[in-house]
Amino acid sequence: MSWQGHEGPKVKLRSACDRCSANKVKCTQEKPECERCRLLSLPCNYSRSMRIGKPPKSRQRGLSNIDPKTLMGGTVTKKLRPCPSAPESACRGSFEDGDGGPWTETMTFEEMLSRPSPPPFAGPSHNSNRPTNMASTNQDQYYHDKGKHGETMDEMLQTLVPDSVQFIEFPNTAREDQKQHPELRSEEEYSDYRSKSLFEEGLARIAPDCAGGIMDVLYGEEALVQMPNLPSSTHEGSSNTHVTSSHNCTRAVMENLAKLYQVCAPAGVENGSHPTTDQVLKANSDAMKDAADLLACPCAKDFCFPIILGITACRVLAWYQVVIDMYDPEIPMATMPTAREDIKHCPIAFGAYQLDEEVSQAMTSQFVLRNLRAMTRFVKTYVENFCSDINKNRPGSCSLIYRSLGTFMQTRLGNTIEQLEDRLAAFDGEYTKNIG
């Protein structure tokens, strides 16, 4: 017999090259050189694979309790353990079902694998009059068969649900129990509640009743949120309203700010009817009185309360600058006629005598200067309460905002008062010169 031309067994190589395996990187498994070794100009070598057959754990999984002779076609020498706490007849009956006859101890491992698995043993109280042909029984039908008490699986699971659990349903018609339980929402109410965004839900907490002016200015449409009336009480001898012990200062300060925005409603501007000087001065005076009362309130304040209160003061100061026709030159938009508020100046009259425009402007400036000086005390109290101590019952993240607002109000108010005093001094000098 000639052995010429006979090739030996093919050597199995590793799937990844030695260099990629050592560096723990993915190998393209190209032979004779992988892509990584070819790009790096390095020698690529595939060593011999040391794996023979399946891994030991995968090969011996599930066979730890079986004699090795079984793998070679032998018989199982290890006896099956009897079922715990069950009579011998029940154990024997559990292994006598199937298509190929009873289970025996001399069966080979291949015969065991070819036989259908018996159903799980249900104990001695299980019904013994069950069908012997379990291979033809559907598994889903088996688990939904009625047990010894005549209950299905769903009925048995319902007994495990506590009585306190209630499932809320939303039928098309109104339920009778909704009258007894008003907390249950109908389907339409639930859909409306679910359609609200997080922004609207958060804004609804602090939005005032008269927030329509703000929303009209910002969005040009109706108010997004309508809140119930804020409970308030009137001080004796005072025209401004002060909130009670059950009030919400944040909502009250939002209402106060909304009144200033309602002075210049978009509907009035479109029709060409701007607010008069008297309307603006009255709105500013009422807003500062309410702001002073809210600032002196001893209740716990929300983190956004100082911000809204500072914006209110800045808004009042802006309206005063409109009245005296004074704008900040540092703001570029202030010089644009379409980007600033406009009012309708009305001459001042004493009975039948009407003052001229120059004298009316001087008297209006005197009145505004008096209110601005009174506003200085408000700004000073604001700075002492919210800007002096950054760790005084407030989050540290908002302290810079409070101090920025306080510095802005002090600077802008001081510059406005100084310019207005210079204007009045020049008017007095010119008026005295004309008289002399």
UniProtKB/Swiss-Prot annotation:
Keywords carried by this UniProt record: DNA-binding, Metal-binding, Nucleus, Transcription, Transcription regulation, Zinc
Residue spans binding DNA: 17-44
Bias-annotated ranges (Polar residues): 125-141
GO annotations of cellular component type: nucleus
Job of this protein: Transcription factor that regulates expression of the viriditoxin biosynthesis cluster and viriditoxin synthesis.
Region (Disordered) residue spans: 51-147, 173-192
A Gene Ontology molecular function term of the record: DNA-binding transcription factor activity, RNA polymerase II-specific
Subcellular location: Nucleus
Biased composition annotated in UniProt, kind: Basic and acidic residues: 174-192
Pfam families: AflR, Zn_clus
Consequence of gene disruption: Leads to reduced transcript levels of genes in the viriditoxin biosynthesis cluster and the loss of the ability to synthesize viriditoxin.
Listed name of the protein: Transcriptional regulator VdtR
Major localization listed first in the record, in broad terms: nucleus
Transmembrane segments: none
